[in-house]
Amino acid sequence: MLSPRRTKFRKQQRGRMKGLASRGNTINFGDFGLQATEPCWITSRQIEAARRAITRYVRRGGKIWIRIFPDKPITMRPAETRMGSGKGSPEFWVAVVKPGRIMFEIAGVSEEIAREAMRLAAQKLPIKTKFVGREEEYN
């Protein structure tokens, strides 16, 4: 699972996901990509599940790039704990994804294989996504 090696602070505020992605919204490495059309937190487990789905389908051919990284710690309180006594401990890591963000890229395979691989990956993610080629992008 993906997570930062070390961070400046252990805990972060939740924040908001307003607007479209201004960075990471174009295909830079591969030929085809999977683009988010909704804002969401994507956990490191979901990223790993999507990555496995893509690699299983394309087998030996093609190269895959993961364009999102879970760098935000999400804290949780233990079950049946009273209010107060501070913020909970970090439980898992998420990547903040805004609409328009390219999450995965793939190269070295045909469009049919890439489309099916991205469809399988999209089923592992909690948001609506869009398959894009190098020429057509969201913003």
Swiss-Prot record:
InterPro entries: Ribosomal_uL16, Ribosomal_uL16_bact-type, Ribosomal_uL16_CS, Ribosomal_uL16_dom, Ribosomal_uL16_sf. GO terms for molecular function: rRNA binding; structural constituent of ribosome; tRNA binding. It comes from the Bacteria. Disulfide bonds: none annotated. It holds the Pfam family Ribosomal_L16. Keywords: Ribonucleoprotein, Ribosomal protein, RNA-binding, rRNA-binding, tRNA-binding. One of its GO terms (biological process) is translation. The keyword Transcription regulation does not apply. CDD domains: Ribosomal_L16_L10e. Signal peptide: none annotated. GO terms for cellular component: cytosolic large ribosomal subunit. Part of the 50S ribosomal subunit. Binds 23S rRNA and is also seen to make contacts with the A and possibly P site tRNAs. PANTHER family: 50S/60S RIBOSOMAL PROTEIN L16, LARGE RIBOSOMAL SUBUNIT PROTEIN UL16M. Belongs to the universal ribosomal protein uL16 family. This is Large ribosomal subunit protein uL16. It comes from Gloeothece citriformis (strain PCC 7424) (Cyanothece sp. (strain PCC 7424)).
